[in-house]
Structures are given as C-alpha cells and as structure tokens.
Amino acid sequence: MDKGLLTRLEDVRHKVADKAHTVAGQASELVVNAMGFLGVPYKRGGTSAESGFDCSGFVRAMYQQTVGLLLPRSADQQAAATQTIDKKELQPGDLVFFNTMRRSFSHVGIYVGYGKFIHAPRSGAEVRVEDMSISYWARRFNGARRVATSSTGENLVSAKQ
C-alpha cells in the first residue's frame, strides 16, 4: 500500500478523533477556568472580564476560551443550540437554565457539580457559585443542556477553525 496514502489516512483519522472530542473531556478545565472569574461584576450585555459579564456573555466567553466553541449570544439561543438532557444526567460543564424574567430560558449558568452552578446573576452582583437546591433557583429551574463540540450544529460555530 502507498505510504503517502497511509499517512493521509492517519491524518484524517486524527482529525475525526479530534472532532469527536466531547466537552465532557474538557469539563474540569472549563469549570476551573470559570472559577477564575469569581468576583467579576455583572454588566448587562457584558462579554468580558474587563467590562463585566451578563449570564449568557459569561457562558459564551468560558466556552470560547476553554473549549474553542462560540455559542450564541443569548440564553434562549444557547438553550436552542444545545442538547436537552435530564437534570439527573448533569455533569460539570453542562448548562443549566432558569426562568428569572417570566420567560423560559432567560438565565443560564455552568454546572460545576454537587448541585452547584457558576453564573453572573444580576445587576449589582458578581460572578459566583450557587446551590441549585436553594428555593429561588429550584422553583425557576428550566432545564439542562449539554454542549456538543460538533462544528456542524446550526447555531454552534467552532472558534478554533
């Protein structure tokens, strides 16, 4: 068999394996990175540590920096672009959504494990970790989603291309 062909096939195999990588494989890095932003102030429409974050801007920035994926900008668009999972299936790095403005998927955070999530909560507050079982969050829980690393998703664009 042609050695050049074998080399090309091996390159393709590695590229496919890289594409098949899941966010779960980078979950601890994602959570550790997100924890590095604890205390950053909330800013409506904010997308950076320098200016401050809103909830979806925080999630988007963490995924772009750590996983190399550019999620949609708003919480409801992020929910639509990700895979629905059962709350019992939550793993670190998954997204958790809440109805905080009398509409579904109006708030988003990153699940960190042990029933807790990290998020940019509201004006006057800072990025922090909270317990999902606290009555405020438990009553408003809207659903859990998992982010796939496939760059073929309609609303999911790979930032590392």
Report the location of each language-model feature:
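Aromatic- and glycine-rich peptidoglycan recognition patches
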Residues: T7, D11, F105, V112-Q161
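Solvent-exposed, polar/charged alpha-helical surfaces in well-ordered, non-transmembrane soluble domains
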Residues: S28, V32-G36, G57-A61, Q65, ...
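Catalytic cysteine-centered active-site loop
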Residues: V40-P92
